[in-house]
């Protein structure tokens, strides 16, 4: 099996971090944080099934992604995860708590409003691609990337856009998988095992982490909450603060 979809950063003997991207994303997105802020850390950042260079085949479920991730972990890791990836991380911690040292959940998307998810999925099907890079850039700026460093946005466009047979551009992901995954985010909120230290970062300008979600996590004995003044792309918009949070559990 090719491992072109597994992005690795840092020294082979560094403390291990498994970094999980969000829906429509890709593993290389973690490169700026890993190389620029956590150079001594060994970061393993896979493209999740249906994204980037990973397998596009179903089943498109949290459980299948967990099964995909387990072989990457030869020892327990700190799992740093964004949005959809954070939901995956929680399921990983429940399935294999022996492999998770701590969780850092960046604006997690879990137990979301089904109406919201239906509308997002419909919008994605209605607009699967763009006329050109400029249109893709505008879409990113209108959907949570406005407070991200422009250089990171340009790197995202260069890495993650691919051409379509019709001469347009689209993200390097599989629309059937991504559309299906929006439904996974409507599944009930579940919590990690109580013994695992869990840090939740809520993005103040994002709608995903509700007071009810925070209240549920606050029942955990080893829970820490942070709120950053940013939109949904936490690691890209607030890299220094994100680094501090990761270091707190390393």
Tell me what each language-model feature is.
Residues 131-186:
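Conserved alpha/beta-hydrolase catalytic His-Asp/Glu region
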Residues 195-231:
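Conserved loop-alpha-helix segment in the C-terminal half of the alpha/beta-hydrolase fold
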Residues 18-22, 82, 202:
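The conserved beta1-alpha1 loop
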Residues 81, 85, 89:
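Gly/Ala-rich beta-loop-alpha elbow adjacent to hydrolase catalytic centers
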Residues 230-239, 243:
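Catalytic histidine-centered segment of alpha/beta-hydrolase-like enzymes
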Residues 7-55:
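Conserved HGGG/HGGXW glycine-rich cap/lid loop of the alpha/beta-hydrolase fold
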Residues 94, 99-133:
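Flexible "cap/lid" loop of the alpha/beta hydrolase fold
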């Amino acid at each position: 099996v090719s491992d072109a979809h597994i992005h690795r950063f840092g020294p082979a003997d560094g403390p291990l971090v498994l970094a999980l991207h969000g829906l429509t994303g890709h593993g290389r997105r973690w490169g700026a944080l890993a190389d620029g802020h956590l150079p001594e850390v060994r970061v393993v950042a896979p493209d999740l099934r249906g994204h980037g260079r990973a397998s596009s085949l179903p089943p498109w479920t949290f459980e299948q992604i967990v099964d995909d991730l387990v072989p990457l972990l030869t020892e327990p890791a700190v799992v740093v995860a964004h949005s959809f990836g954070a939901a995956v991380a929680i399921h990983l911690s429940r399935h294999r708590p022996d492999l998770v040292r701590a969780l850092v959940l960046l604006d997690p998307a879990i137990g979301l409003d089904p109406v919201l998810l239906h509308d997002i999925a419909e919008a994605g099907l209605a607009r699967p691609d763009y006329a050109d890079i400029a249109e893709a850039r505008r879409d990113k700026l209108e959907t949570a990337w406005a407070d991200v460093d422009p250089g990171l946005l340009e790197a995202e466009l260069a890495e993650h856009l691919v051409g379509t047979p019709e001469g347009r551009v689209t993200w390097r992901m599989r629309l059937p998988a991504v559309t299906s995954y929006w439904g996974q985010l409507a599944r009930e909120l579940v919590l990690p095992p109580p013994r695992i230290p869990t840090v939740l970062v809520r993005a103040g300008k994002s709608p995903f982490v509700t007071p009810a979600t925070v209240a549920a996590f606050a029942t955990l004995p080893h829970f820490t909450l942070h709120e950053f003044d940013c939109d949904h792309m936490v690691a890209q918009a607030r890299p220094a603060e994100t680094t501090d949070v990761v270091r707190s559990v390393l």
